[in-house]
């Protein structure tokens, strides 16, 4: 697919894709994913062509930006590593997020409380989000999916080939997708300047790690307060001793 020069993959983005292990695919290859294989390593792991990954990210972003109402786009992730990324993507682009379990009938049963009629669905994994893809096929909703080389591609209209099992890989794909959508909408005018949002914001974080970090920050703050109190007491003691010395000298 030939793209205008402004959509070319930059060296910085290529380094991000490689650093996040987006290029590491599975050992098995589904027949429709064969065009995305760059090569096979000696250990049997198939390497994804990140150039084709970028082309599909741009294509998906152009589809998303073409929908007038951002809320008509539904971003789904039942996979734990993709839930934070989906929520951040929705916050930045205005899409509707479904993070966690997808309620069966959300697209087909209008009686359910969670019923939606989207114009586009984006899923993190065709296997874990199979119910959403199946219901989308019933009501003719186009589907964009992050697919590994062994992922099923039935009812998937646009497949973004990548490593959809790693937390950094998933977060980075959603980050790049959100950035390209905002650029196409005109929210980010200058393509030569980096986005102020960092990719780390889209990465999954273990709740225990977050709690531990908060506890460490609280402990550090408490230690600083204690040090300040001790310093103040020492200063007061020094001032008092100096005053007494002057009184004794005056006698």
Curated annotation (Swiss-Prot):
Lineage of origin: Eukaryota, Fungi, Dikarya, Ascomycota, Saccharomycotina
Sites of N-acetylserine modification: 2
Organism whose genome encodes this protein: Lachancea thermotolerans (strain ATCC 56472 / CBS 6340 / NRRL Y-8284)
Protein known as: Small ribosomal subunit protein uS2
Protein task: Required for the assembly and/or stability of the 40S ribosomal subunit. Required for the processing of the 20S rRNA-precursor to mature 18S rRNA in a late step of the maturation of 40S ribosomal subunits.
Keyword Cytoplasm set for record: yes
Gene3D superfamilies cross-referenced by the UniProt entry: Glucose-6-phosphate isomerase like protein, domain 1 (3.40.50.10490)
HAMAP family: Ribosomal_S2_euk
Chain residue ranges for the region called Disordered: 213-251
Chief location of this protein within or outside the cell: cytoplasm
